[in-house]
């Protein structure tokens, strides 16, 4: 097989002729050239003005659109949305489960998502395996386990006494005072967490509470935030759906509100004052079946009645939005469906794209390296045969993502007439 750019071939690739949406929030630019060299963006500008170098590989993308590699700031590779998920865990050997999770990583990358935050359920070894080139997937920030109070969102013990998390390994850190919350944070940091996740409210899938119920107290959340700051300023994400818990989380100093479905005006004020991010995870409202119990489905239905109105108000007032899907609750590899859902809140397609690129990079503290197509940044890039400004929903269908580049390597090549890229570890 001939050398393939991004594997063992030339290290300078020129993508030319495409329309570029660079992720900064600026409008599209036609007939561009994007040069990738040694894993980073070089020249980005008009195709007719680009410098040429002997031996470079030129890929003609006329009629396509280039965008930065996307982020999904809220996934769970632990699980999938198949109704038989629990049954498979019981039947499969643990090694099979590991390979199933690796497949979810690949599906996510092939969909155009090159960076994710996994907010609970897998250990740091998956992150490390991707970074070492042992398996294909997006780069990852991981939370490992959720900090919850006894009987809260991440206490999954059923009335029978059985804890379903025993099937998948530790999923929770239960803490019932500030000292326990601090200790739980230290355990997570010891185990390799990049981000700490706290449960500030109840939730849809938790058996013993409602989304409006409060979770950890302000004092408990503040203890987590303080401890995380002592360790390289680790961010804290808050599962928060009800209005009171959202405000508790913000007063405790969290970096992001996950879901935020019932946020009220005071909560929006707090978000604006503190510069916190909102990750709406709208994709969960568009799911049917899966592993929702009848009780969880009813909670979801009730939340949906108010969530779109409240989240739209947050968008209208300028709260910083980052894209996240809760993939795992929903399907993996369909992450970019969330872009169309964000436009339902009043965002323009360009704003939705920025939520999945630059804004998400800012949330993860990676905006100096990722999130936009700019000279000097890490070369994460996708090409689509759709026009996302006319049909942004097309990006949610992986067949419309015809090329994916991560760290300057082509990891998906669906362009007609080109040999498929060998998808294997470095």
What are these regions (language model features)?
Residues 100-126, 137-146, 193-206, 234-235, ...:
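Divalent metal-dependent hydrolysis catalytic cores, especially in the metallo-beta-lactamase
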Residues 86-99, 165-183, 235:
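Active-site mouth loops of central-metabolism enzymes
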Residues 179-278, 300-320, 368:
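Histidine/acidic residue-rich metal-binding segments in metalloenzymes
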Residues 230, 304-387:
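His/Asp/Glu-enriched, well-ordered alpha-helical/loop segment
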Residues 38, 362, 375-422:
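C-terminal cap of metal-dependent C-N hydrolases
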Residues 2-14, 20, 24-67:
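Histidine-rich, glycine-flanked metal-binding segment
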Residues 64-132, 150-156, 219:
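Metal-associated gating/positioning segment near the N- to mid-region
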Residues 81-85, 128, 154, 207, ...:
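Histidine/acidic-residue-rich catalytic or RNA/ligand-binding cores of hydrolases
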């Amino acid at each position: 097989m001939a050398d393939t750019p991004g594997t063992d071939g030339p290290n300078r690739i020129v993508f030319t002729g495409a329309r570029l949406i660079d992720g900064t929030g600026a409008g599209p630019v036609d007939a561009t050239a994007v040069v990738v060299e040694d894993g980073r963006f070089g020249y980005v500008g008009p195709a007719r003005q680009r410098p040429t170098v002997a031996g470079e590989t030129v890929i003609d993308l006329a009629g396509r659109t280039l965008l930065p590699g996307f982020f999904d700031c809220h996934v769970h590779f632990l699980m999938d949305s198949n109704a038989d998920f629990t049954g498979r865990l019981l039947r499969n050997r643990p090694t099979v489960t590991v390979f199933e999770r690796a497949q979810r990583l690949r599906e996510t990358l092939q969909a155009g998502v090159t960076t994710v935050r996994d907010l609970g359920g897998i250990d740091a070894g998956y992150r490390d395996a991707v970074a070492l080139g042992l398996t294909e997937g997006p780069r990852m920030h991981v939370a490992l386990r959720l900090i919850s109070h006894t009987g809260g969102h991440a206490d999954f013990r059923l009335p029978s006494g059985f804890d379903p998390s025993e099937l998948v390994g530790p999923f929770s850190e239960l803490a019932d005072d500030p000292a326990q919350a601090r200790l739980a944070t230290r355990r997570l940091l010891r185990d390799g967490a990049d981000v700490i996740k706290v449960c500030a409210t109840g939730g849809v899938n938790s058996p013993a509470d409602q989304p409006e119920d409060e979770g950890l107290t302000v004092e408990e959340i503040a203890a987590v935030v303080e401890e995380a700051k002592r360790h390289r300023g680790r961010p804290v994400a808050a599962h928060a759906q009800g209005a009171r818990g959202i405000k508790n989380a913000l007063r405790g100093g969290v970096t992001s509100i996950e879901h935020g479905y019932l946020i009220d005006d005071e909560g929006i004020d707090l978000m604006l004052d503190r510069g916190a991010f909102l990750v709406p995870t709208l994709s969960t409202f568009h799911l049917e079946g899966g592993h929702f119990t009848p009780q969880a489905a009813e909670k979801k239905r009730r939340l949906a009645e108010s969530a779109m109105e409240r989240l739209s108000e947050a968008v209208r007032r300028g709260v910083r939005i980052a894209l996240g899907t809760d993939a795992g609750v929903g399907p993996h590899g369909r992450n970019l469906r969330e872009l169309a859902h964000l436009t339902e809140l009043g965002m323009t397609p360009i704003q939705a794209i920025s939520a999945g690129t630059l804004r998400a990079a800012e949330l993860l503290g990676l905006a100096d390296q990722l999130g936009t197509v700019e000279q000097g940044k890490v070369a994460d890039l996708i090409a689509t045969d759709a026009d996302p400004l006319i049909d942004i929903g097309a990006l949610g269908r992986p067949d419309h993502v015809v090329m994916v580049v991560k760290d300057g390597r082509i990891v998906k090549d669906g362009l007609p007439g080109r040999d498929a890229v060998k998808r294997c570890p470095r």
